C-alpha cells in the first residue's frame, strides 16, 4: 500500500530534477513563460493515478495448465509456521511521521498567511479596484505585492508617491495585477502543497526556489512585452526600490532581495 505514494514521490522528484536541469536552456530558447510552465509537470505527476500493478511488477508468467498446478502443489514444501514476533511497524510509523510534518508545514504557512493578511488589511485604505482585484495602500506592505485567491488584493506601500514616480507605480501595479491574471496565487498554494509532501527532499526545496524565480521572470517578461522595452529602465528602478526580505510564500512580491 505504501509503494504507490512512494512511487509518486520518486517520480515527481525526478521530474523536479529534470526541470531544474533544463529550465535555463529552455528559457533562453523559448522564453521565460515556457520555462515557468515546465513546473506544472511535477505537480501533475503528483495527482496522476499509479501505474497498473502488472506494469510495475513487469508482468508475471501465469500457470495456465492444470497439471502445472498439481505439480506445483506437490513440489512445494509444507509451510512452516513462523513465530509471531510483536514489534514496531516502522512503515506505519514512517508514514505517520511524514504526514505529521507535512500537515504541520501547511498549517504553519496557512497561519503565517492569515496573520500577514490580517495585519496588512487592518491598517489599509482602499485605493482602487481593477476587475475583481481590490487595490489597497497599507503601511504594513513592504513593497507592491499580490495576495489572495478568493478575495484578491494588490497591496501598495503607504509611501507609494514618495518612493515611486508615476511610471514606476504603473509598472509595479501592472506586475502585481499580472500575477492575479495568470493564476500565480493559486500556483503558489499548489507549490506549497507539493513542497509539504516533499518536505524531506532537498531537490524539492531547490525546485520551489527556482519555481518562484521563474514565476517572477515570466511576469517581468509579460510586463515588458505589453509596455515595450522603452519601459525597462523605469521597471528596473521599481524592482530595485521594492526589493525587501521576509517574503510570504503564498503571496507574490514585486521582487525580493533574494531575487535580485
Predicted features by range, described:
Residues 54, 111, 174, 181-182, ...:
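Short helix/loop segments within enzyme catalytic domains
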Residues 155-173, 207:
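Short pre-active-site segment immediately N-terminal to the catalytic Zn-binding motif
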Amino acid at each position: 500500500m505504501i509503494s504507490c505514494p512512494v512511487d509518486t514521490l520518486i517520480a515527481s522528484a525526478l521530474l523536479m530534477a529534470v526541470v531544474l536541469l533544463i529550465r535555463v536552456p529552455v528559457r533562453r530558447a523559448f522564453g521565460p513563460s515556457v520555462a515557468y510552465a515546465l513546473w506544472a509537470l511535477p505537480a501533475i505527476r503528483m495527482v496522476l493515478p499509479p501505474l497498473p500493478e502488472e506494469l510495475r511488477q513487469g508482468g508475471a508468467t501465469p500457470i495456465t495448465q492444470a497439471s502445472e498446478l498439481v505439480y506445483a502443489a506437490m513440489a512445494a514444501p509444507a509451510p512452516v509456521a513462523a513465530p509471531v514476533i510483536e514489534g514496531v511497524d516502522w512503515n506505519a510509523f514512517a508514514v505517520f511521521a511524514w504526514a505529521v510534518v507535512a500537515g504541520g508545514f501547511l498549517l504553519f504557512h496557512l497561519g503565517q498567511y492569515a496573520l500577514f493578511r490580517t495585519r496588512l488589511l487592518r491598517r489599509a485604505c482602499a485605493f482602487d479596484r481593477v476587475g475583481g482585484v481590490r487595490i489597497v495602500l497599507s503601511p504594513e506592505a513592504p513593497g507592491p505585492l499580490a495576495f489572495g485567491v478568493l478575495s484578491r488584493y494588490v497591496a501598495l506601500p503607504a509611501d507609494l508617491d514618495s518612493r515611486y514616480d508615476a511610471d514606476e507605480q504603473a509598472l509595479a501595479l501592472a506586475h502585481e495585477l499580472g500575477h492575479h491574471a495568470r493564476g500565480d496565487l493559486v500556483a503558489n498554494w499548489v507549490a506549497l502543497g507539493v513542497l509539504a509532501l516533499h518536505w524531506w527532499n532537498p531537490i524539492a526545496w531547490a525546485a520551489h526556489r527556482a519555481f518562484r524565480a521563474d514565476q517572477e521572470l515570466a511576469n517581468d517578461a509579460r510586463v515588458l512585452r505589453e509596455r515595450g522595452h522603452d519601459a525597462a529602465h523605469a521597471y528596473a528602478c521599481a524592482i530595485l526600490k521594492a526589493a525587501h526580505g521576509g517574503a510570504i510564500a503564498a503571496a507574490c512580491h514585486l521582487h525580493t532581495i533574494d531575487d535580485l
